[in-house]
Amino acid sequence: MSKDDLIQFTGTVLELLPNANFRVKLENDHLIIAHTSGRMRKNRIRILLGDKVTVEMTPYDLTKGRVIHRH
């Protein structure tokens, strides 16, 4: 799968879960579970409750995603 196949959405962090996972509400009112991308972990970017984030998702599983940017 190439980067072109991934879908990006904007959402808000609703809940902090263990192991750097988050419950995110997308702009289209869907709830997903998202984890922090490796680059955000490496640079120690903190994600807090209520933060606006950009989530990258695969078209095969629309219930999970990866947080790639914090606004």
Curated annotation (Swiss-Prot):
Subcellular locations according to the entry: Cytoplasm
Protein keywords: Cytoplasm, Initiation factor, Protein biosynthesis, RNA-binding, rRNA-binding
A Pfam family matched in the record: eIF-1a
GO molecular function term, any single one: ribosome binding
Coiled coil: none
InterPro entries, per database record: NA-bd_OB-fold, RNA-binding_domain_S1_IF1, TIF_IF1
Superkingdom of this protein's organism: Bacteria
Subunit structure: Component of the 30S ribosomal translation pre-initiation complex which assembles on the 30S ribosome in the order IF-2 and IF-3, IF-1 and N-formylmethionyl-tRNA(fMet); mRNA recruitment can occur at any time during PIC assembly.
Family matches, as PANTHER family: TRANSLATION INITIATION FACTOR IF-1, CHLOROPLASTIC (PTHR33370:SF1)
Family (UniProt): Belongs to the IF-1 family.
Protein name, per record: Translation initiation factor IF-1
Gene source species: Rickettsia canadensis (strain McKiel)
Organism phylogeny: Bacteria, Pseudomonadati, Pseudomonadota, Alphaproteobacteria, Rickettsiales
Gene: infA
